[in-house]
């Protein structure tokens, strides 16, 4: 703990943005007396200094948009856990994202990723998603549109109740060539018959 001349009593600081090979990081200090914060830059990492990710690690992508879980290090695949900004009305699960400057494919949406989110109104699901966990959209009362770009979903890769609990006012948009197959698939995974599924 550091006490400076103007009376601030700074804590030991928290890394709020990790440094990478391409960008500096940020460390934020908070005054334990008044709550004021100050930031300090963390130098870019040199070659070889990057933390080696392993399967199961939960990290934030370089854009600070999402928390993801490393699914396969060799194939460079991650699982989307949740958005960083819990107040975001529009969320995009991209086809790929960068972690420590390295590109990873986003291939799965974790269980409960948006469960109980009463703010989000639009969710776009990227083309590389091949697996969806349980209760991903349950309780998303303000959700108006889910746009799926993926054509890789199957009975085996979509969890039971993956689409349960979606508001009746939600519309799901899917690639036109998958409309018939996805309608059957989603209903078998808990989707209400009152939710519209449209092709685009």
PLM feature spans:
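Extracellular modular ligand-binding repeats in secreted and cell-surface proteins
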Residues: 1-49, 97-98, 105-109, 114
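Structural signature of tandem-repeat unit edges
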Residues: 16, 86-108, 118-131, 141-156, ...
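Short, surface-exposed terminal/edge motifs of secreted or surface/virion proteins that either
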Residues: 40, 182-185
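N-terminal low-complexity, Pro/Thr/Ser-rich intrinsically disordered segments
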Residues: 47-67
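LRR flanking "cap" motifs
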Residues: 60-115
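Extended beta-solenoid/beta-helix repeat architectures
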Residues: 72, 80, 126-127, 131-132, ...
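Consensus positions within tandem repeat domains that build extended binding/scaffold surfaces
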Residues: 110-113, 133-136, 159-162
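A structural signal for leucine-rich repeat
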Residues: 160-165, 184-189
């Amino acid at each position: 703990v550091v006490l400076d001349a103007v009376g601030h009593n700074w804590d030991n600081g928290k890394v709020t943005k990790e440094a990478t090979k391409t960008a500096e990081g940020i460390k934020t200090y908070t005054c334990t007396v008044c709550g004021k914060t100050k930031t300090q830059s963390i130098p870019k990492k040199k070659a070889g200094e990057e933390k080696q990710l392993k399967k199961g690690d939960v990290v934030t992508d370089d854009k600070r948009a999402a928390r993801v879980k490393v699914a396969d290090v060799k194939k460079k695949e991650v699982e989307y856990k949740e958005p960083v900004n819990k107040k975001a009305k529009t969320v995009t699960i991209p086809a790929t994202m960068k972690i420590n400057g390295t590109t990873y494919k986003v291939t799965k949406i974790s269980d409960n990723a948006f469960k109980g989110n009463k703010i989000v109104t639009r969710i776009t699901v990227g083309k590389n998603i091949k697996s969806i966990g349980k209760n991903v959209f349950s309780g998303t009362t303000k959700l108006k549109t889910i746009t799926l770009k993926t054509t890789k979903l199957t009975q085996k890769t979509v969890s039971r109740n993956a689409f349960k609990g979606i508001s009746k006012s939600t519309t799901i948009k899917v690639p036109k060539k998958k409309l018939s197959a996805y309608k059957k698939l989603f209903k078998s995974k808990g989707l209400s018959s009152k939710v519209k599924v449209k092709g685009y």
